[in-house]
Regions:
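Single, function-defining residue in the core of a domain
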Residues: 1-225
């Protein structure tokens, strides 16, 4: 049932106000540990500290977590990861490189997965029929990751809605998931998809907690400090 049991890490985030182009430039030049996204790596470390050592732990993240340093630090903390990819990463293939998209195009579907997709504005509720592909890949560290591992061996699970499942005027559902878990068969791939879908429940839990539990969003402060 994937029922949430509690919080292993929780923090209130006060985002610094930075205007326009300065925000983009500043974010690009900051060391990873000074970036806002580093909070996800801290969450992994805090979770490891409060969960029994004999329990296998997995951080599930959305596209915001598609950061090489995050994947590296999560593994070092003793956690696995499952994240939705946002970058068309270059992957090592023999003595050359190919993009993740190029590799997936060559891969034939290895099975199908169906689930009920709830409706929302601009999208009808339906049973989505997804084609499933999976494969091991090797991603290399960006130049900004000085001092870390040169490469990471991970698995990619790709799910894309079949054309005959998509209503007219709507885009197909498509996820590219990267994980440190071994994925060598359809059962393992579907397990990763199920874990990723748990994000919907987790996000709803946080939304209710913020709005109905702690009413954080109703608090108006003169100063964020």
């Amino acid at each position: 049932s994937y029922l949430p049991l509690g919080f292993s890490s929780l923090r209130i985030w006060n985002r610094e106000r930075v205007e326009g182009r300065k925000k983009t430039n500043r974010r690009a030049t900051l060391p990873y540990k000074d970036k806002e996204s580093y909070r996800w790596a801290l969450a992994a470390k805090e979770s490891v500290a409060c969960i029994p050592s004999d329990v296998r732990k997995t951080i599930v993240g959305d596209r915001e977590n598609d950061i090489y340093a995050f994947m590296e630090e999560t593994l070092e903390a003793g956690c696995d990861f499952l994240i939705r990819s946002s970058h068309n990463r270059k992957c090592a293939v023999d003595d050359d490189f190919e993009t993740l998209t190029e590799l997936l195009i060559k891969r034939k579907p290895m099975g199908e997965y169906r689930f009920s997709l709830p409706g929302r504005k601009g999208r009808k509720n339906r049973t989505a029929i997804m084609e499933v592909r999976f494969m091991p890949i090797t991603i290399h560290a960006p130049h900004s990751n000085a001092g870390g591992k040169e490469k990471l061996d991970v698995y990619c699970v790709h799910v894309k809605e079949r054309a005959d499942s998509v209503p007219a005027s709507e885009e197909p559902i498509e996820w590219r998931l990267l994980t440190s878990h071994e994925v060598t068969n359809l059962t393992q791939a579907v397990q990763c998809i199920e874990w990723y879908k748990c994000r919907w429940l987790i996000e709803e839990l946080f939304r209710v907690t913020k709005s109905k539990g702690f009413t954080i969003e109703n608090v108006q402060l003169e100063d964020g400090e």
